[in-house]
Amino acid sequence: MESILESRSGHWAGGPAPGQFYRIPPTPGSIVDPXSVLYGSPITRTQNPMVTGTSVLGVKFEGGVVIAADMLGSYGSLARFRNISRIMRVNNSTMLGASGDYADFQYLKQVLGQMVIDEELLGDGHSYSPKAIHSWLTRAMYNRRFKMNPLWTT
């Protein structure tokens, strides 16, 4: 038995120590480090939404628009958070409501808030139209989905 182990030790010389992993260098332009996929390193993107919300309703009528959402955040099947808002005022003409993962909604809220601040700093009197916000959101969500790191919101 010892002779088998000794012969193998020469074959595997230079490998990782017991309990360690081989480090595969990333290829130029790769999105994901192959070592993390092959050897079970921590995944740095959301695989399953944790805190989710469900219902958002928008109604258009002759005098304007009404948007409503429930305030429940579910942690799996547990009704965990009972007072979270999933509606955001982007500017004077645009509101955003989101269902799905609450963390992704918070991310979108932060990015859109910064975009609006940057636009207001120009001081030209213009702001983002609802069509411009919609266009940006569709491109941003498609871009993330294309990179296999989707935003889990609708």
From Swiss-Prot:
Keyword Cytoplasm belongs to the record: yes
One Pfam family named in its UniProt record: Proteasome
Keywords, sorted A to Z: Acetylation, Cytoplasm, Nucleus, Phosphoprotein, Proteasome
UniProt KW Nucleus keyword: yes
GO annotation, cellular component aspect: cytoplasm; nucleus; proteasome core complex; proteasome core complex, beta-subunit complex
Sites of Phosphotyrosine modification: 102
Gene3D superfamilies: Glutamine Phosphoribosylpyrophosphate, subunit 1, domain 1 (3.60.20.10)
GO biological process terms, semicolon-separated: proteolysis involved in protein catabolic process
SUPFAM superfamilies linked to this entry: N-terminal nucleophile aminohydrolases (Ntn hydrolases)
Propeptide: 1-45
Subcellular location: Cytoplasm; Nucleus
Residues carrying N-acetylmethionine: 1
Major localization listed first in the record, in broad terms: cytoplasm
Subunit annotation: The 26S proteasome consists of a 20S proteasome core and two 19S regulatory subunits. The 20S proteasome core is a barrel-shaped complex made of 28 subunits that are arranged in four stacked rings. The two outer rings are each formed by seven alpha subunits, and the two inner rings are formed by seven beta subunits. The proteolytic activity is exerted by three beta-subunits PSMB5, PSMB6 and PSMB7. Forms a ternary complex with SMAD1 and OAZ1 before PSMB4 is incorporated into the 20S proteasome. Interacts with PRPF19.
Protein family (similarity comment): Belongs to the peptidase T1B family.
Functional summary from the UniProt entry: Non-catalytic component of the 20S core proteasome complex involved in the proteolytic degradation of most intracellular proteins. This complex plays numerous essential roles within the cell by associating with different regulatory particles. Associated with two 19S regulatory particles, forms the 26S proteasome and thus participates in the ATP-dependent degradation of ubiquitinated proteins.
Protein name, entry field: Proteasome subunit beta type-4
